[in-house]
């Protein structure tokens, strides 16, 4: 399954859609900044909330929790490294490798690819493509990708951008 997020600048108070391979709106995402952290709500095509990405407030480093259908399934954890950022998806056992700032990375589970993220050129403009491997939960994969991006951009105190250069 391939999902696409159109390139533009988002903030946590913005709304945007995630399209499928046919250009149809498959998911809707709405960001909110509340007094106790940032939240990103993910809705299905019938506007039912199916996932939530929320900032973990009490933490030394930016952390985001992923909930799917009201159940916490993952926490994005930044590994301590000196050179390039590395992430681990706690709760799912997923490892994340690649160039996060260019949105060109892969999420793996036990050496098998779960989802790859890269820039793609499609008819509706510059987008980032999420290629979700068969047998994987696309909602969880989408929420984890959005959470990784939220962690990246929360580390930059001067930036309120969401999903980088999108």
What is the predicted role of each segment?
Residues 1-166:
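Intrinsically disordered, low-complexity proline/glycine-rich segments
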């Amino acid at each position: 399954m391939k999902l696409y997020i159109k390139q533009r600048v988002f903030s946590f108070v913005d709304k945007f859609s995630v399209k499928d391979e046919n250009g149809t709106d498959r998911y809707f995402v709405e960001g909110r900044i509340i007094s106790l952290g940032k939240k990103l709500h993910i809705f299905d095509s019938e506007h039912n909330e199916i996932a939530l990405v929320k900032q973990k407030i009490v933490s030394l480093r930016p952390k985001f929790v992923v909930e799917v259908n009201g159940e916490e399934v993952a926490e994005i954890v930044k590994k301590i490294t000196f050179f390039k950022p590395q992430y681990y998806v706690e709760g799912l056992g997923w490892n994340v490798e690649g160039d996060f700032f260019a949105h060109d990375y892969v999420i793996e589970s036990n050496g098998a690819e779960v989802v790859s993220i890269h820039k793609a050129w499609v008819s509706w403009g510059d987008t980032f493509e999420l290629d979700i491997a068969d047998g994987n939960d696309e909602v969880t994969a989408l929420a984890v990708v959005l959470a990784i991006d939220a962690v990246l951009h929360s580390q930059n105190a001067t930036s309120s951008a969401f999903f980088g250069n999108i």
